[in-house]
């Protein structure tokens, strides 16, 4: 039995262009847990997940309604919103296949440094895409907007995660044979002021936060699931090459060369490198459908010491 942190990508709940309703996200979550059932049943597993579209939707609904909410509150709400979908999907898979583990959704806070340079340079996209005609209206909400290939998106600070405050609870649930859902959306960002903890407006990268969690609970493996089977170098070029088993020094060299896209593959590779350098055995980057093959070493990108 191995201890594994599995970081679900956005495609575990939504595909590009799909309607962001409960039914669509539940259907994807159900298929995700069906694919992962052997991994979750036979190992000690923590599930983490992103919240990019969802937290943007939550924040936008508050801004439009005039009720108002801090971004860190919206992150916490997204943990409950997505956690319910994941918990319902897993519970129904548990019934179908007579699995034994109970699932728990944990509102997870993650400590960051209030002096992190990310607070003066927001780059993390959240929410939907906006057209050129819509962007000025969006800016009236006080949002910082950035142009991407498919349109404009709101960007927010994304500070580096330092510590998972609910780590003892996660450890307890694992030790007692449960399946925790934690660090949703990278965790609720908080800062320490003296002896007090307070929320701060940001969205933490869920892969980097998952790496911090995996190190803290002494996980054997970090598995980052996305919409491709492998990490590629020279992506989209004639000499594109998929990476299979790669030593941490080699993939770190590719990272420094700028081989991996900002906001997409780059943070996943960074998370894998940090995990291995902090004592992890292996990190996997692959698709949900390929997870079993990756664990057995047959496919996917596997980062080792």
UniProtKB/Swiss-Prot annotation:
Enzyme Commission number, as recorded: 2.7.2.2
Pfam families: AA_kinase
Cell inner membrane is among the record's keywords: no
Pathway: Metabolic intermediate metabolism; carbamoyl phosphate degradation; CO(2) and NH(3) from carbamoyl phosphate: step 1/1
Stated name of the protein: Carbamate kinase
GO molecular function: ATP binding; carbamate kinase activity
Compartment(s): Cytoplasm
Enzyme class: transferase
Gene3D superfamilies assigned to the protein according to its UniProt record, in alphabetical order: Acetylglutamate kinase-like
Main localisation: cytoplasm
A Gene Ontology biological process term: arginine deiminase pathway
Record's keyword terms, sorted: Arginine metabolism, ATP-binding, Cytoplasm, Kinase, Nucleotide-binding, Transferase
SUPFAM superfamilies to which the protein is assigned, alphabetical: Carbamate kinase-like
Sequence similarity: Belongs to the carbamate kinase family.
InterPro entries reported in the protein's UniProt record: AceGlu_kinase-like_sf, Asp/Glu/Uridylate_kinase, Carb_kinase
Catalytic activity line of the entry: hydrogencarbonate + NH4(+) + ATP = carbamoyl phosphate + ADP + H2O + H(+)
Keyword Kinase set for record: yes
GO cellular component terms, semicolon-separated: cytosol
């Amino acid at each position: 039995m191995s201890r594994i942190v599995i970081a679900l990508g956005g495609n575990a709940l939504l595909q590009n262009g799909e309607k962001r309703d409960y039914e669509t996200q539940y259907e994807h979550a159900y298929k995700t847990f069906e694919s992962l059932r052997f991994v979750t049943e036979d190992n000690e597993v923590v599930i983490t997940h992103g919240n990019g579209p969802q937290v943007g939707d939550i924040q936008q609904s508050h801004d439009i309604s005039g009720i108002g909410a801090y971004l860190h509150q919206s992150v916490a709400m997204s943990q409950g919103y997505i956690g319910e979908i994941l918990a319902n999907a897993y519970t129904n898979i548990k019934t179908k296949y007579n699995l034994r583990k109970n699932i728990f959704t944990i509102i997870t806070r993650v400590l960051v440094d209030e002096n992190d340079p990310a607070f003066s340079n927001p780059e993390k996209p959240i929410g939907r895409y906006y057209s050129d005609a819509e962007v000025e209206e969006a800016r009236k909400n006080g949002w910082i907007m950035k142009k991407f290939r498919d349109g404009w998106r709101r960007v927010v600070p994304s500070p580096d995660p330092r510590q998972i405050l609910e780590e003892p609870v996660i450890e307890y649930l694992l030790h007692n044979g449960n399946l925790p859902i934690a660090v949703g959306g990278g965790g609720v960002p908080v800062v320490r002021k003296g002896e007090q903890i307070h929320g701060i407006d940001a969205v933490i990268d869920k892969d980097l936060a998952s790496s911090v969690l995996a190190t803290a609970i002494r996980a054997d493996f970090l598995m980052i699931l996305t919409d491709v089977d492998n990490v590629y170098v020279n992506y989209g070029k004639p000499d594109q090459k998929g990476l299979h088993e790669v030593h941490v020094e080699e993939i770190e060299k590719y990272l420094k060369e700028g081989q991996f896209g900002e906001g997409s593959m780059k943070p996943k590779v960074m998370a894998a490198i940090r995990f291995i350098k902090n004592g992890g055995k292996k990190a996997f980057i692959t698709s949900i459908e390929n997870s079993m093959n990756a664990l057995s070493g047959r496919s996917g990108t596997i980062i080792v010491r």
